[in-house]
């Protein structure tokens, strides 16, 4: 019975006919020492700050945080915790556009990530973060591999969420109003839940 199971558990069940028993259903993701060093060097200027990564776009164009909502989230987070640095993540193809948009915001506590040419470059950066906010499940899974606290934004579809939910020890999902698109989610919940996860991680 695969009802109400996460997709990783469904795939692991395919090993049963071969007599293979998985030791864990946690993700593994391997990055190079150079990738990790580069990420640490990039973040070193934000020493003692809580690092929040926000991925604003997904592989599916409907799964995104628009810049009006993003600005509300950014300002709301900073109003509640001044000791943060927010890094905006983007795909290589969208890097220049998003970097320009972030620059136009003029917020000192917000910066674009460096150009991540591969998904493992992005993973190395995510590994160093204290919290990740994302509407895209691929970034959620990367953060889960390193047990980074996660705020995921998901369409109001519990079956889909069960399949692709975060697997970090600490995660909260904010749902949209619709089952097929990310519209009408509560920005205030994203802000408040983010601060709660940061505080929980400190304790």
Labelled PLM ranges:
Residues 1-203:
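Catalytic machinery of carbohydrate-active enzymes
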């Amino acid at each position: 019975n695969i009802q109400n199971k996460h997709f990783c558990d469904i795939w692991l069940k395919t090993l049963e006919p071969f007599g293979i028993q998985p030791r864990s259903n946690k993700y593994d993701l391997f990055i190079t020492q150079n990738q990790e060093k580069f990420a640490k060097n990039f973040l070193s200027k934000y020493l003692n700050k809580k690092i929040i990564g926000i991925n604003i776009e997904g592989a599916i164009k409907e799964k995104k945080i628009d810049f009006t909502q993003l600005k509300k989230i950014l300002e709301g987070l900073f109003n509640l915790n001044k000791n943060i640095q927010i890094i905006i993540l983007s795909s290589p193809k969208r890097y220049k556009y998003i970097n320009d948009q972030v620059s136009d915001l003029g917020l000192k506590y917000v910066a674009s990530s460096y150009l991540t040419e591969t998904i493992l470059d992005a993973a190395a950066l995510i590994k160093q973060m204290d919290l990740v906010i994302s509407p895209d499940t691929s970034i959620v899974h990367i953060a889960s591999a390193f047990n980074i606290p996660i705020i995921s934004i998901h369409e109001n579809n519990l079956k889909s969420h069960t399949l692709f939910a975060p697997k970090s020890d600490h995660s909260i999902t904010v749902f949209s109003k619709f089952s097929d698109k990310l519209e009408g989610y509560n920005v205030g919940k994203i802000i408040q839940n983010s601060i709660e996860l940061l505080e929980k991680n400190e304790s």
